[in-house]
């Protein structure tokens, strides 16, 4: 039986470039090499694509083949092409781990759809919606799910933002965050007016749309979702910060200050509620493949959705694979399952595509 060729796309021009490289290295190390042949498609910070062998230690090392995506005279015309060796690369499945802008916001997913390539994760719309906290929270709220209260502010209105107004409706502390960044990039905790103005400048430097939210006093819990039509839900995990602050980019990937508790020490009723909410959120946003749903549990045991991450971190320390490991699915099995889900979803999507003018023929027939 021939192996499937898996293209792991990583890097990119977003602020989460380095996290993406770590995710790719983790997948490359643990992918089932008896079933799959994997190659790395690395996008550097300038947006250039490179082909790398799976046996690597440092993705920043530049011994590689630059590649282009060219139009060819074939039924599905997009192919990966290397400049130095005259071959066309054919991938059976793409595993994208380009976190952040242009990677999990639907841009890369749209390219892969145009290339008719099966890929791991959610489609264009779900990826785009999941990346935009404003839009995703509106959809979740309209579906009857509790989200962290928020107000959205556009860049053109930033000079009319009144600190006292937000304190009157939300109290202190406040959180100010870009609408479309991940890994807590650009997020600030605010306790006074001077900090508020600096937080606005910081958030607007990452996005032209920001969210202002109250602090939810309580616990930060996370749940992993895996599947397409009948998704499975992992056990709940908890992020515990010793200084009672918030889970910053620095805490996640530099200092690694947070303690991760899996499973979370919560009673069965609350655990079941969180898992049900995670499932509903996944379905409301029409996600597929995988997602991580982050919630807050306040002091009254009320659950608020913080965000739905459609392309969660896949590093050795990331919560998503850890949650599944405790739930009985090791990293190799998880990667294999995600590839299988990608192939299954692609087969179903192709049923909706029409070729040879089938739709026009139908309408011509109707008019006769």
From Swiss-Prot:
Binding, Mg(2+) 1: 294, 307
Pathway membership, UniProt: Cell wall biogenesis; peptidoglycan biosynthesis
Pfam families: Dala_Dala_lig_C (PF07478), Dala_Dala_lig_N (PF01820)
TM regions (residue ranges): none
A GO molecular function held by the record: ATP binding
Subcellular location, record wording: Cytoplasm
Keywords linked to the UniProt accession: ATP-binding, Cell shape, Cell wall biogenesis/degradation, Cytoplasm, Ligase, Magnesium, Manganese, Metal-binding, Nucleotide-binding, Peptidoglycan synthesis
Cofactor: Mg(2+); Mn(2+)
Enzyme Commission no: 6.3.2.4
Residue ranges constituting the ATP-grasp domain according to the UniProt record: 137-340
Recorded superkingdom: Bacteria
Entry binding sites for ATP: 167-222
SUPFAM superfamilies registered for this protein in UniProt: Glutathione synthetase ATP-binding domain-like, PreATP-grasp domain
One GO CC annotation: cytosol
GO process annotations (BP): cell wall organization; peptidoglycan biosynthetic process; regulation of cell shape
Catalyzed chemical reaction(s): 2 D-alanine + ATP = D-alanyl-D-alanine + ADP + phosphate + H(+)
Residues that coordinate or bind Mg(2+) 2: 307, 309
Cofactor binding: number and manner: Binds 2 magnesium or manganese ions per subunit.
Enzyme class: ligase
Function recorded in the entry: Cell wall formation.
Family that this chain belongs to: Belongs to the D-alanine--D-alanine ligase family.
Name of protein: D-alanine--D-alanine ligase
Species per Swiss-Prot/TrEMBL record: Blochmanniella pennsylvanica (strain BPEN)
Gene: ddl
